Amino acid sequence: MALGAFKLDEALRSLDAVQLAKVSGRLVRVSGMLLESLGCRRMTGQRCLVEQADGSLLEAQVVGFNRDITYLMPFKKPMGLTAGSRVFPAEEETALRIDDSWLGRVVNGLGEPLDELGKLTGRDLLPTELPRVNPLKRRPVTEALDVGVRAINALLTVGKGQRVGLFAGSGVGKSVLLGMITRQTKADVVVVGLIGERGREVQEFILHSLGEEGLRKAVVVVAPANESPLMRLKAAELCHSIAAYFRDQGNDVLLLVDSLTRYAMAQREIALALGEPPATKGYPPSVFGMLPELVESAGNGADARGSLSALYTVLAEGDDQQDPIVDCARAILDGHIVLSRRLADVGHYPAIDISASVSRCMNQVSAMPQQRAARNFKELYSTFEKIKELIPLGGYTPGMDAKTDRSVQLAPALERFLRQEVGEGSELGVSLATLQSILK
């Protein structure tokens, strides 16, 4: 009897080792980066594994469905897929855990390390969804943020918790100015999202803009242009979740995203592949729904401790300030700094067009004397810009208008104030004192 029971237990244990049949589907169509499968039903947002020709498994996410067809978008470029390739439901994704050990690390859009410094661990759970803050509980912007750039500190003062866009065409100096702000801004934690940009710039930004000292207090999330659109979306959302985590720990956080336009382009690729109709300049409606959701996840939280200031670069294609993404970003951000190609072409750096730029939180974080001085500076600079081309032609006669005379007299000082070397810093107090000394 005992021997029979022993053999039965042994037989039952051997059954546990038998691999049972897996639920699977099959690929029926591949179009670009969009995969269509039949028979593997998953909810949107869940993941599947697609078997490739060499036996490796390609991870993909469900982005939509049509009756029995499930639409998948892979995280990496597919290699060796065939009609009928098997599709398996992936196990539940492991939640990311985070703490201060993430500082100094470089990761991809899935939170996987790229710096070969070992696996990332942590004590706290990092939410997979974008953080949300009740608008009635969000702490207002009341304190100025020193970014170390004279023109911004004095004329376009930003606050802790403000979200600002850096608008410019290609090759006008967005990344250079972003690097200046990264080095000069006093923040406890810096979170950098390099989304859809050139891979060459990743190492350059880490070495030159952050530096060894800056990297110690930073987390860099990378998804260069050769990554799949889904990975670019994930990277942008991940850096916002990381920044919100450190904000809620009581830190003053600076979030830098380069660029918001590439995030919109990634969503455009996915939406068009799914058959969504294009609208303005080829951007489907879903793009303009996702941008506010991303931006609103930044900013101050409900807690009295900590802040999250965000700076987004926005590419104005063809220097068009009415580009749909530029226009949308201008509406949802708390301010915008416009870089001018005309200024960049004459060697004026940073090429900030102060007449076209605005900080919507400046009145909340600056005193009235500074606001008056900034308005006076802009007025004088704008007046000189209007008549400077007439001066060599003899079209300007001194004594005809006092304001014009004063703008011409102060023009060299105004120009010097707006220019700043890449390695030069200008603290907030020094910037304000210099502004007052010019206008006295």
Indicate where each model-derived feature is located:
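N-terminal accessory targeting/assembly segments
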Residues: M1-R105, L110-L114
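Phosphate-interacting basic helix/loop segments used at nucleotide- and nucleic-acid interfaces
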Residues: K7-L12, F88-A90, V147-I152, C239, ...
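Residue-level signal for beta-strand positions within conserved beta-sheet cores that form or flank
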Residues: V23, L58, A83, W102, ...
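Flexible glycine-/small-residue-rich
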Residues: R29-S31, G39, Q52-D54, G64, ...
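Active-site phosphate-binding and catalytic loops of NTP-dependent enzymes
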Residues: S56-E59, T94-I98, P113-K119, L136-T142, ...
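P-loop NTPase nucleotide-binding/switch module
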Residues: S85-V87, T94, L114-Q162, S175-M180, ...
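P-loop NTPase catalytic core
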Residues: A154-L155, G161-K440
